[in-house]
Amino acid sequence: MESHGKTHQKEHDNDLSPKPITLSKYSKRVELKTLLDRSDRGAGLAGKRVVIGGWVKSARAVKKNSPPPPLPVVAAPSPSSGGDQAHTTANIRCTEIIQSKMNIFKRFFDVLSGGGKTYPIFDKTELAGQKAVPPPEYVFYFLISDGSSISSLQVVVDSALSTVPATQLMALGTCIVAEGVLRLPLAASAKHVIELEAEKLLHVGTVDPEKYPLSKKQLPLHMLRDFSHFRPRTTTVGSVTRVHSALTLASHTFLQYHGFQYVQVPVITTTTGFGEMFRVTTLLGKTDDKEEKKPPVQEKDGFSIDTVKAVIKEKTRLIDHLKRSDSNRETVVAAVHDLKKTNDLASQIEMKQKSKTGTLVKPEKLDFSKDFFGRDTYLTASGRFHLESYASALGKVYTFGPRFIADKIDNARHLAEKWNVETEMAFAELDDAMDCADEYFKFLCKYVLENRDEDMKFISKRVDKTITTRLEATASSSLLRFSYTEVISLLQKATTTKFETKPEWGVALTTEHLSYLTDEIYKGPVIVHTYPKAIKQFYVRLNDDKKTVAAFDLVVPKVGVVITGSQNEERFEILDARIGESGFTREKFEWYLDLRRHGTVKHSGISLSMEQMLLYATGLPDIKDAIPFPRSWGKANN
């Protein structure tokens, strides 16, 4: 695995000898990582002509050098002024000459260094395009990012190249495609090694600074969630996304190398047994035509629903404005709270309206035989059932896809839609599954450190300074394993901590229990296995003691459970009995029982939550920042 993993290491160029510039595949431009993620940081490419594209991260404008002003003319002293006056006049002339000369040198230095006086806001006459006064000419200095790397490229643009007004060209988020020549910075103190002197602007995609949410100062992550379609343009979310991509590639790399076959499993399923699930139906909203419909209730306490909706729209617009402005968080929070109360009022009016019209259909009254699929269907919460059928033929299989849980919980660790990597292995028992989880987890930690080092350095500075040390320690050590019974005993010995849920045998381990175990006692990831059968799913294999089942959780500090796994029940009689004990309809599991009727075999598997893994790898505190478009209870913005 080591030799194979090395072939995938270092996505950027770390060779000592600089390579020639190559165009981005399927594009007529050069990716910035090709220029900047080299051993020489691009210095060896000076003089090369390239086309680059990206979005403006910062911008400044410097007025072009104008001719030096003429020396001041001072009248000669009159003969009657006396010697003292003549001496004073001579001193003034000398001082002014020195100041004038120093101003010339200062302007010359500004041109060479790219510094000088900046003009982020332009005169009204220039913006209005008045012809009476010729607009001043500027040199623009942009920092451009194209998302291929943590690094940005400085692009120098003469204002004469652009037909777009200066304020629009310089707005944060503007997309620019430029052709020019790479050069070494003129300023010796420049932080960057290479820059592009633009000769052509091939494309300018402007933004409206008044409406673009990223136009203002850096927004915190929790506020960026309202603009999930724009937040990947921020440096932090861009780095997190590249780490996410690396974890995905690492998962395929590890599993393919170890002989797992990739299988697609359905998102729509008839199988239940995984907690609250989303129902799939086309019947909601349909009513009996014979049912008398009463006129809707339009008002509550003198407020019409249309009026309330108009107020909601205005309050939403105000909150958007506050978020883009420099308003403090307390003001924004107060406005959001006020909007919530208005939304609650609208909900009350609509609920009363629906209760009066008699058009609301309850799910239990629906005839699902008339539904699209002719029966109850749900969004899947796990793909392991379907993987079992392929493991019974191919031996080792895996899948990667969305999983849906309808728990009405809104906190930093819950999502309604998550993405899981799931495996299933025939001829494997619980210890085999734990070994697989152990090696897979450590491989992910090592892969991220070796292949996304620049992003990890940035995230370490911006989010969590301990992530690199934590991942290095995890990748190089063996994970400790404890039975559930041993964990309960450890928790009961904790004399300095009082738990809200008393640790007793048979009680499900809570977040505070797991946090104490990983953050306080062992300060690292651990595996907890052999749980009481009452707190795990019915399909997990029953142990010989008839009290425990063959399940495990891989738990990490600050995050909680990242990987779950189990050896599933292969014995028909026991599985059939446990389905009945759990209160499920046997009919829904006939296909699953068939796998035990015909050619049954011992098998086990694991399920990794990609979002939880990303939290551990980056130190992010909230799972809603670990997925591109978060869906949680009450929130689905786009």
Curated annotation (Swiss-Prot):
Pfam families: tRNA-synt_2. Keywords: Aminoacyl-tRNA synthetase, ATP-binding, Cytoplasm, Ligase, Nucleotide-binding, Protein biosynthesis. Its EC number is 6.1.1.22. GO terms for cellular component: chloroplast; cytosol; mitochondrion. GO terms for molecular function: asparagine-tRNA ligase activity; ATP binding. Gene3D superfamilies: Bira Bifunctional Protein, Domain 2 (3.30.930.10). Residues 1-23, 62-87 are annotated as: Disordered. One of its GO terms (biological process) is asparaginyl-tRNA aminoacylation. Its main location: cytoplasm. It is found in: Cytoplasm, Cytosol. CDD domains: EcAsnRS_like_N. It catalyses: tRNA(Asn) + L-asparagine + ATP = L-asparaginyl-tRNA(Asn) + AMP + diphosphate + H(+). Residues 1-16 have a biased composition (Basic and acidic residues). The keyword DNA-binding does not apply. Belongs to the class-II aminoacyl-tRNA synthetase family. PANTHER family: ASPARAGINE--TRNA LIGASE, CYTOPLASMIC 2 (PTHR22594:SF36), ASPARTYL/LYSYL-TRNA SYNTHETASE (PTHR22594). This is Asparagine--tRNA ligase, cytoplasmic 2. The lineage of its organism: Eukaryota, Viridiplantae, Streptophyta, Embryophyta, Tracheophyta. The gene is SYNC2.
